[in-house]
UniProtKB/Swiss-Prot annotation:
Origin organism lineage: Eukaryota, Fungi, Dikarya, Ascomycota, Saccharomycotina
Alphabetical list of Pfam families matching this protein: Acetyltransf_1
Species of provenance: Saccharomyces cerevisiae (strain ATCC 204508 / S288c)
Reactions it catalyzes: a D-alpha-amino acid + acetyl-CoA = an N-acetyl-D-amino acid + CoA + H(+)
Entry EC no(s): 2.3.1.36
Protein name: D-amino-acid N-acetyltransferase HPA3
Gene3D superfamilies the record matches: 3.40.630.30
Compartment(s) where it occurs, according to its Swiss-Prot or TrEMBL record: Cytoplasm; Nucleus
Free-text function comment from the UniProt entry: N-acetyltransferase that acts on a wide range of D-amino acids. Catalyzes the N-acetylation through an ordered bi-bi mechanism, in which acetyl-CoA is the first substrate to be bound and CoA is the last product to be liberated. D-amino acids are toxic for the cell and their N-acetylation, preceding removal from cells, plays an important role in detoxification of D-amino acids. In vitro, capable of acetylating histone H4 at 'Lys-8' and polyamines like putrescine, spermidine and spermine.
Amino acid sequence: MSNEEPEKMVNDRIVVKAIEPKDEEAWNKLWKEYQGFQKTVMPPEVATTTFARFIDPTVKLWGALAFDTETGDAIGFAHYLNHLTSWHVEEVVYMNDLYVTERARVKGVGRKLIEFVYSRADELGTPAVYWVTDHYNHRAQLLYTKVAYKTDKVLYKRNGY
């Protein structure tokens, strides 16, 4: 049995779909887990506003959920948006968040979520997709280097925000 076969077996149980209004409870559960993973706590109105934006067709912020088809559980999400840039004529897609539950990691869920975002970016006519990750998140970077390339850029943020 090759190293890829266990991932493939589990991968067949994963379905990724765009977030719908009925997914709010499942998404909220993952959103709280994600905050714990990121060692942060956000006010409840951030979750409420973010989810409302996902389902508002006038807002260019989308979410996708990964589900285990055997259990029906939501096991991961990706959030993405497109925006103008001075580097391309067409807009680009920024994957704002990517999260997979601890029990579902290294089973192909992250890859399926990224592939979903890539597919949606292609549909939008904005195939350039980028994201950032924590420098110490080596497990995720093992996947990222298979589906994208690492740049030499360093991210800076305004003080206090």
